[in-house]
Amino acid sequence: MTSPMTSKDSKLTLAEKVWRDHVVSQGEGDQPDLIFIDLQLLHEVTSPQAFDGLRMAGRTLRHPELHLATEDHNVPTEGIHNGSLLEINDLVSRTQVETLRKNCEEFGVRLHAMGDKKQGIVHQVGPQLGATQPGMTIVCGDSHTSTHGAFGAMAFGIGTSEVEHVMATQTLSLKPFKTMAINVTGELQPGVTAKDLILAVIATIGTGGGQGHVIEYRGEAIEKLSMEARMTVCNMSIEAGARAGMIAPDETTFDYIKGREMAPTGQDWDDAVAYWKTLPTDEGAEFDTEITIDGSAITPFITWGTNPGQGLPLSSVVPSPEDFPGDNEKVAAEKALAYMGLTPGTPLRDIAIDTVFLGSCTNARMDDLRIAADILRGRSIADSVRMMVVPSSTMIKEQAEAEGLDKIFIEAGAQWRTAGCSMCLGMNPDQLTPGERCASTSNRNFEGRQGPGGRTHLVSPAVAAATAIKGTLASPADLD
């Protein structure tokens, strides 16, 4: 999109409206706009250099109250009692966490550390506190910042130099993104989740299909999703190559935010909702690209390869390189099959799994835990499988325990852990060993993502739970 016009007669998309309302200075010609940033989220991995840059330049944070930090990437998910640094065995991880604590204290940034009830994965902490709100611009040194777009926010990941720039100025210099509408018609079938939906979208448009765009997810199937399910969809927009993903705010959004710690109250709440209701895309507004997908045709979906676009319905077989039209795709398939140790023609349901990981900023919220617990209730996981359940935040962990979900997981034979990024990425003790095959509710299945030589299949919480019981990739329907 070009910089949105402010004329009342203009027909604007959701993304264009949010952009318009944050332009501090509009660039001339091909020059970027200067955009105000409402909220910057921080964690221990991508913030140290930014804080150092401020310190070396003798600067302070321009708006410390518009920053929110938590510890998530490097924290262990077992053996945590009081949040002491001594509970982190790895020296590099411990140093990064310690550095974040010192930086937040020095620069006046609100931090939720290990052992804090409000600690968790950064993309859960913002929503659960009510800090994430419609119409905001939100950034973080993390690609899955797109999660917050589920609330109608313009949320995207940035690099460390940009993190420092936001700290110093609370602005970013950016050219407007292109806009894409993905219309998901119909209703999702029973047993089909938001994770199946977004994996199907990525398989349809490819990992570069959304490059340079903000994707707005629209249609009946999207409107009927819960807030947590919407977060799952927007979370993986980056895996489709997009800069951000957004869903228009509605009553579902407002109901989720209302009453949370950082949400507006009283007249401020009424004023906020009145503004939020102006944000949905105008009738007649034009997107740079539009795609329509039949939501009712989506079935349980998984990945077979080493990028999120290499996915198929669970009912399929492992593809052959010859199934792909282009030479580059054939080579990519050959490489993926070799790394994953798969033989073309093998039914996906016959693939044996060693580990099941239910966690990450994609799928470790209450909806996800309830779905998995309902499937595991009264059942046991296969003897050949280890299952780790890692809630997305300490608040989610406590809520799940209040509902008795932890007991269901433990009685089924799963490990119930404390909050953190965990096995989503190989930056903490939770890792796969070489050749170990995992059904994971996370967002990336790159080579070595979950540990050197580890093999990852991206799945929904429902498929994860069924797979843990069967010992092979499975959906709940396979348990009947």
UniProtKB/Swiss-Prot annotation:
Keyword set, alphabetical order: 4Fe-4S, Amino-acid biosynthesis, Branched-chain amino acid biosynthesis, Iron, Iron-sulfur, Leucine biosynthesis, Lyase, Metal-binding
A molecular function (GO) term: 4 iron, 4 sulfur cluster binding
Pfam families cross-referenced by the UniProt entry: Aconitase
Reactions mediated catalytically: (2R,3S)-3-isopropylmalate = (2S)-2-isopropylmalate
Keyword Membrane found: no
GO biological process, one term: L-leucine biosynthetic process
Pathway the protein acts in: Amino-acid biosynthesis; L-leucine biosynthesis; L-leucine from 3-methyl-2-oxobutanoate: step 2/4
Cofactor: how and how many bound: Binds 1 [4Fe-4S] cluster per subunit.
Record carries keyword Chloroplast: no
Enzyme Commission no: 4.2.1.33
Ligand binding ([4Fe-4S] cluster): 361, 421, 424
Required cofactor(s): [4Fe-4S] cluster
Entries under SUPFAM superfamilies matching the protein: Aconitase iron-sulfur domain
Subunit text: Heterodimer of LeuC and LeuD.
PANTHER family hit by this protein: 3-ISOPROPYLMALATE DEHYDRATASE, HOMOACONITASE, MITOCHONDRIAL-RELATED
Family to which this protein belongs: Belongs to the aconitase/IPM isomerase family. LeuC type 1 subfamily.
Function: Catalyzes the isomerization between 2-isopropylmalate and 3-isopropylmalate, via the formation of 2-isopropylmaleate.
Protein's name according to its UniProt entry: 3-isopropylmalate dehydratase large subunit
Lineage per the UniProt record: Bacteria, Bacillati, Actinomycetota, Actinomycetes, Mycobacteriales
